[in-house]
């Protein structure tokens, strides 16, 4: 529901949590914001960096063609440091292809052609196709490339999945 954490304060055994939707009082506070961790938790921000991950969806393609590319209907991720991931769309009509296209944030109109070029590199026998959709989100990369899960001053945190599990 797009809750934004504005501040929090621990009083005895209760956290007073201020969000853009109002104040919440709770016994437990979990920060699971991954690439969207705010300045409210600077102790988490020092442990990782948000990196843009860009995704495209191809135009609709014949289901028989998609089935040849993804016969087991599995999600595929390469093992390079700059990761690409791809799969068939749930309706098996499009190729969903994503990854990091630049060391800096770039416009979606610029990222889509770059991803399409990489998609064609992965699947060189693709016919000429177009991109129908393009979007991006932030993933949290840790300096040791491992997820960070723990507890500090009663606040439980989980982040730094380095792109694993991106939908």
Predicted regions span which residues?
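A conserved short coil-to-beta-strand element within the FAD-binding core of flavoproteins
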Residues: 1-15
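Conserved mid-domain beta->alpha element of the FAD-binding
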Residues: 146-148, 154-167
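Active-site substrate-recognition segment that forms the wall
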Residues: 7, 17, 23-154
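Short beta-strand segments that buttress and anchor functional surface loops
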Residues: 17-19, 160-161
